[in-house]
Amino acid sequence: QFFLNNTTPISNELIPKFQVGNERLFADVQSHIRRELFEYLPPFRASISAYNISFGIFTYLAEQIKKTNVYDFIIIDTDSTFSDEKGDLIDHADKVFLVTRQDLYSVYKTNCMLGNINYSDSDKFLFLCNAFQTEYENTLLNAESHSAFMVNEYIHWIPECEKMHLDELAKVDGLQ
């Protein structure tokens, strides 16, 4: 959400709809979906737990959206904390992108996360190394790092990317 032009949080009137969740959830939020280079649901002002919203509601919402055939892709960006509800979301997903970095700590944290899920389906799980820098050691390839996964794609470090706008990032080689 950092790179979006409109970072205004989701409307407070939608919070109760996420707290309850029903068969009209997608219909209720559809008019609040924004469009920049892609369509997205605005971010929440605070964490969803602060609103007493179950993370499982996003699995439910994704299933509702998927049934409409309106979108080719439904992307749900989460933090790295694992929970049963995130496990359920992963189970329901057609594709799962796991983003890591090339340092030993990132390999360790990714391995810890993988200890909680079955990631044997190589068509479903894609591993991305973000902010890759060739001048630094790539511990993802070291036997000593005990990496439990193989990286499918490397996304090279982009100098000062935090100063770029979304439309500029979309033109960067390797991000298309």
Question: What name fits each language-model region?
Answer:
Residues 83-103:
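Inter-motif core of Ras-like GTPase G domains
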Residues 52-63, 111-135:
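P-loop/Walker A phosphate-binding loop and immediately adjacent motor/lid segment at beta-alpha junctions
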Residues 42-43, 75-77, 96-101, 125-131:
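Conserved beta-strand segments of the P-loop GTPase G domain that flank and frequently precede/overlap
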Residues 100-106, 157-159:
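Short, acidic/turn-prone active-site loops that include or flank metal/cofactor-
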Residues 1-39:
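Phosphate-binding loop that captures ATP/GTP phosphates
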Residues 106-112, 162-165:
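Short, charged, surface-exposed secondary-structure boundary motifs
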Residues 24-30, 35-85:
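Phosphate-binding/switch loop-helix module in NTP-utilizing enzymes
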Residues 131-137, 141-174:
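Beta-strand-loop-alpha "switch" segments that mediate conformational coupling across diverse proteins
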